[in-house]
Each structure stands twice: as C-alpha cells, then as structure tokens.
C-alpha cells in the first residue's frame, strides 16, 4: 500500500513535510495533501472491493458459501470495532453496505447489529463502552440505521417497517420512563436524552425517504439480491 501514489509519484509523506521556511499556518492540511490522501483511500477501497468480488462470486459449493460468510463476519467485526467508532467516516463504510447487499441474511445481520448497538446496548465488564463513550456509540449506530435503511434500495418495505417499529418502540419506552420520573426527570434537551433524540431523528430521516413503504399493505419495489443463495 505504500506504493499507492498519484501518477507523478507524489506521496502523502511529501505533503506532510512542510519544507524550509514553513510557518505555523502550514500546520493545517493543505488541499494537495488532502487530495493525495483521498486518492490513496480510493485506491485502497478499489483494491479491497476487487479482492472481495473475486472471493465471493456466485456460490457454487459449500466451501465458497462458507468463505462468503467468513468474510462477512470479518467485515462486520471491523465495522463494529473501527468504523462505527470513527468520527465522520463517510466512505469506508460503503464496502460494508455493498457486501451486505449480496445476501438478505447479511443485510438482516447488519441491521440487527446496528439496532442492538443503538437501542439495546448494555455495557459489559471489561469494555470501555460506558458513560459518554457508550452514548456516542449508540448515537452513531442510530445514525447508521437511518442512512442505511433510507438509502439502501435492496431493503424492502417489510424490513423498513420492522426497523421503524423497533425505533418507535424504543421512543415510546423512553417517553413512558420520562413520565414515570415526574419532577425528578432530566429536563428536555438534557444530555441524558441524547440517544432518544438520535433515535427520533433516525425515524424522521427514514420517513422522509421511505414513507411509502411505511403504509399498511405497502409492497416494496426493492430489487432482489443479485448474488443471493440459490
């Protein structure tokens, strides 16, 4: 990967070296540095996508099917540990979105993971997912639920309704708990309600894109999974 540079052989390490006469103003990333790093990211993602395409193919044997599931579990683990916790990641996650499109079980597992992280996360011993870090992780997971369901064309109407039902059930439980606390409840807008607001925003976002699928009896026009198991 160190050889991935632009056509002129310019490497990111060149842009990181301010050279003689540098000033404090040059501490901020220059546009050419960003362009080089973006080019490398594109090249890495392209190489990864081509590798995964060669690996998955159309399953013609049990070994190939097993390999596909193993790769998906690896990607899902990397997404949960790294991408989900990365602030404003805007590109790398689309490798995960693409792989999830290959099989309806992958899409279900991905959504299940996101819903679990956002709605039902329970801190466990020996992890750092406590307090504010756990809240941030849950907010990020809710945001991914919204963008994934709203924009993934292969997510059908029934799945969309299932996701929104889970989100609304969580919101309803939060409102009941808030009412039960009475005067001791944190005021609206307090940090304690951050996850509730994130989930509410997710519902509104999904509604804006998929409101037709939320109607009773709606039939989705989502395309079938191109590489689904036969």
Cite the ranges covered by each PLM segment.
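Solvent-exposed loop and edge beta-strand segments that line ligand/cofactor-binding
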Residues: 84-85, 133
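Alpha-helical repeat/alpha-solenoid scaffolds of the HEAT/ARM/MIF4G superfamily
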Residues: 1-81
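Eukaryotic scaffolding regions of large macromolecular assemblies
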Residues: 93-230
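Generic helix N-cap/helix-start motif at coil->alpha-helix transitions
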Residues: 88-91
């Amino acid at each position: 990967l160190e050889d991935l540079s632009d056509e002129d052989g310019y490497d990111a390490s060149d842009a990181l070296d301010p050279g003689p006469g540098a000033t404090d103003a040059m501490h901020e990333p220059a546009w050419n540095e960003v362009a080089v790093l973006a080019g490398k990211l594109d090249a890495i993602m392209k190489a990864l996508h081509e590798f995964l395409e060669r690996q998955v193919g159309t399953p013609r044997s049990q070994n190939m099917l097993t390999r596909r599931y193993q790769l998906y579990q690896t990607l899902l683990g990397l997404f949960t540990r790294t991408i989900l916790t990365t602030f404003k990641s805007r590109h790398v996650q689309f490798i995960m979105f693409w792989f999830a499109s290959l099989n309806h079980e992958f899409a279900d597992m991905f959504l299940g993971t996101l819903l679990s992280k956002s709605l039902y996360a329970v801190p466990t011993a020996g992890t750092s997912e406590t307090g504010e870090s756990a809240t941030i992780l849950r907010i990020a997971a809710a945001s991914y639920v919204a963008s994934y369901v709203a924009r993934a064309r292969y997510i059908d109407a029934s799945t969309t309704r299932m996701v929104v039902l889970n989100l609304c059930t969580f919101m309803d439980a939060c409102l009941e708990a808030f009412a039960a606390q009475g005067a001791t409840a944190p005021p609206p807008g307090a940090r304690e309600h951050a996850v509730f607001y994130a989930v509410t925003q997710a519902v509104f976002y999904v509604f804006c894109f998929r409101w037709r699928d939320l109607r009773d009896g709606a039939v989705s026009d989502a395309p079938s999974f191109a590489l689904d198991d036969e």
